[in-house]
A protein has these predicted regions:
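Bacterial Sec-dependent N-terminal signal peptides
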Residues: 1-23, 607
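Short regulatory "switch" loops immediately downstream of catalytic or recognition motifs
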Residues: 10, 69, 288-297, 495-497, ...
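Intrinsically disordered, low-complexity coil segments
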Residues: 10, 16-17, 204-206, 295-312, ...
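Short N-terminal segments immediately surrounding and downstream of signal-peptide cleavage
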Residues: 22-42
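Outer-membrane beta-barrel channel domains
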Residues: 23, 45-50, 55-57, 67-334, ...
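Extracytoplasmic/secreted proteins, especially bacterial periplasmic and envelope-associated proteins
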Residues: 31-34, 38, 58-65, 83
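Generic structural marker for isolated residues within well-ordered, non-membrane alpha-helices
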Residues: 36, 228, 475
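Exposed, low-structure sequence patches enriched in small/polar residues
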Residues: 224, 328-607
Length: 607
């Protein structure tokens, strides 16, 4: 171990000077990512888009690249560029220039208009940024009003241009006190009505693209906190660290089908290597949240003075290892290949700490000798093509299992895969205008598993596309950027969930006899056959970034969420049968049942 640390120290000590920070830029910094995507699609800068979030170091480099190409930018883009160059001033070894500030222009800056405190030492060996976080959102439709509020703070530090440390806390609440008694008759119904991240049944997360949360107890609605952060050792060619952040793998402007970043963030060891312009390696080993109780692992709690004990069961351990190799042979083409494994052992399996590995092969080595059931492995790919400036074509593919024999017409089985394709036309003939379209399909059993603890999920949120198995999603967006800091979006989303199946290898029949579950029969069922849930949403979003990380937003949305009966008599044992209300309650929050016109107004700074 001492030798490894010595080698790392030598490698980082002889590296080139880097005056930036390896701190991730949150995926929900929508305006910044939209601006970077615009510059990339217009051909002003070059960057891979399959793996996010970007670090502040990477973003600063992109902005510098755009600054060198400013003759290709229009006036609005130049103003946006100057705006973000100021936001990333510390990464460029300068001080932030604020409207209302107390500063010496060299080492410290206390900004009041866009609240934050920035500091850097005279030789740039130490940099720090401290920001408050505060926001509120009022959402109203015919079912009443929801009030969301959040507050907290974030701290970012960089030491010796090679060590980044950061952390943040956001306390959130969704209040159902103003929900209509016509739709929510009791206090418990109002609590459930405010918990819009879950279906009305509160059994599973809803099929929506909202970031996932884990609710705490609250007698007014939904309450949760989110603490993120990490520590990273970095240089110009790579970084290694441990962090708790949301990540997204796979090219997408709406929702990725590989790793969407929708599930609550999990702690992970991360490695990123970029030794040359045309190659990038990303790897992580994560501690997932199984939400599956281990009947052999519990705490004993004293419940009476006499010493009576109660068992408090603990969840199973659940881990994930994944890698992604991104190649950019020419500026117009980038493709990524990777694989991952979900495993549940008492401790970390050292084999899955290897960054460059095919994990399914390692799984066979570790489990086949005792004829044990495999862990859950996956493979995936993403491709990005920019044949001309202003046009981006992309696709991503997720494979849970693949057999060539299933491609034959004589074989009724379908490979459990998911694919996504899309395009982005931006900046021509009207500057600032873009058109996006995205289509996704996921086949039966591509994200599920017969062992609950091995599903492709964390905190019960599917880590791939939010629609899950046997589903289809169509997303279109027309966006316009009329002035610095403003983004207007008109979007339409059509989400359809088809027949829902459990992954059963065996099942117990009505007579009590254990029978083959017929997974082969399940994946031989016709995919996309009978819709059981559908949600259509037409949405207009207006967003204005007054100062960096300070937003005013207005959203108008019409949605129509419907369930459909599926009570056939010849169904497989694995199929979930029910009436329209059952599916609507399972997949949709009660607040969005049926037809709704919803208005949302929000203000925030620091997200």
């Amino acid at each position: 171990m001492k030798r490894i640390c010595l080698i790392l120290s030598i490698l980082f000590s002889i590296s080139w000077y880097v005056g930036a920070q390896n701190i991730p830029v949150p995926l929900n910094y929508e305006r910044l990512y939209d601006f970077l995507d615009e510059l990339i699609t217009d051909g002003a800068i070059t960057a891979q888009t399959a793996v996010r979030p970007y670090s502040r170091q990477q973003v600063a480099q992109m902005l510098k690249q755009a600054q060198m190409m400013d003759t290709t930018l229009d006036n609005r883009q130049k103003k946006d560029l100057a705006f973000y160059l100021n936001e990333f001033a510390l990464e460029r070894d300068t001080m932030v220039n604020a409207y209302v500030q107390y500063t010496d222009h060299q080492t410290y800056n206390l900004s009041l208009a866009d609240p934050q405190f920035s500091y850097k030492s005279g030789n740039n060996s130490f940099k720090m940024r401290l920001r408050p976080i505060l926001g509120a959102d009022v959402t109203i439709n015919k079912k009443g009003a929801l009030l969301q509020r959040w507050w907290g703070a974030e701290l970012q530090m960089d030491i010796a241009n090679h060590l980044s440390i950061w952390g943040s806390l956001r306390d959130n609440s969704w209040s159902g006190n103003w929900l209509s008694e016509k739709y929510f008759h009791t206090d418990i119904e109002r609590i459930h009505g405010a918990r819009i991240h879950y279906g009305a049944s509160q059994a599973h997360p809803a099929l929506s693209n909202m970031p996932g949360v884990q609710y705490k107890e609250a007698n007014y609605g939904g309450d949760f906190s989110d603490s993120k952060g990490g520590i990273s050792l970095y240089t110009w060619w790579g970084s290694i660290g441990i962090q708790r952040e949301n990540i997204r793998w796979g090219d997408s402007y709406h929702a990725s089908n590989i790793l969407s970043g929708r599930n609550p963030a999990v702690p992970m060891i991360t490695l990123q290597l970029t030794p040359c312009r045309w190659f990038q390696l990303d790897y992580f080993h994560a501690w997932l949240v199984s939400n599956v109780l281990d009947s052999t692992y519990f705490y004993l709690e004293n419940t009476t003075k006499e010493g009576a004990l109660a068992k408090n069961y603990r969840p199973y351990n659940k881990f994930m290892a994944a890698n992604m190799f991104t190649f950019t042979p020419i500026r117009q083409l980038s493709f990524s290949l990777g694989n991952s494994i979900i495993y549940a052992e008492n401790t970390i399996q050292a084999a899955y700490l290897i960054p460059i590995a095919f994990y399914k092969s390692l799984d066979h080595l570790l489990t086949k000798g005792i004829a044990s059931q495999n862990q859950n492995s996956q493979a995936f790919a993403s491709i990005s093509i920019r044949p001309i400036n202003h046009l981006h074509l992309y696709g991503s593919f997720y494979l849970d299992e693949f057999k060539l024999s299933r491609l034959k017409k004589s074989n009724p089985e379908h490979n459990p895969i998911s694919y996504l394709v899309g395009l982005n036309w931006s900046g021509w003939p009207v500057r600032g205008l873009s058109l996006k379209a995205e289509f996704m399909r996921s086949y039966i059993a591509c994200y599920t598993h017969s062992i609950d603890v091995l599903t492709y999920a964390s905190n019960s949120y599917n880590m791939g596309h939010y629609m899950g198995d046997n589903a289809q999603s169509i997303y279109t967006e027309l966006a316009y950027r009329p002035m610095r800091g403003m983004l207007l979006k008109l979007s339409y989303t059509n989400d359809v969930k088809y027949n829902s199946y459990a992954y059963l290898r065996v099942y117990r029949g009505p007579d009590g006899v254990i029978r083959d579950g017929g997974i082969g029969e399940t994946i031989a069922e016709k995919p996309f056959d009978h819709a059981i849930y559908r949600n259509d949403a037409l949405r207009l979003d207006g967003m204005y970034e007054v100062h960096p990380n300070m937003y005013l937003t207005l959203s108008l949305e019409y949605n129509n969420a419907q369930g459909f009966d599926n009570q056939k008599t010849d169904a497989l044992p694995s199929e979930d049968l029910g009436d329209a209300q059952h599916y609507l309650d399972t997949f949709c929050p009660l607040y969005y049942h049926g037809k709704n016109f919803t208005t949302s107004i929000a203000f925030s700074f620091g997200f």
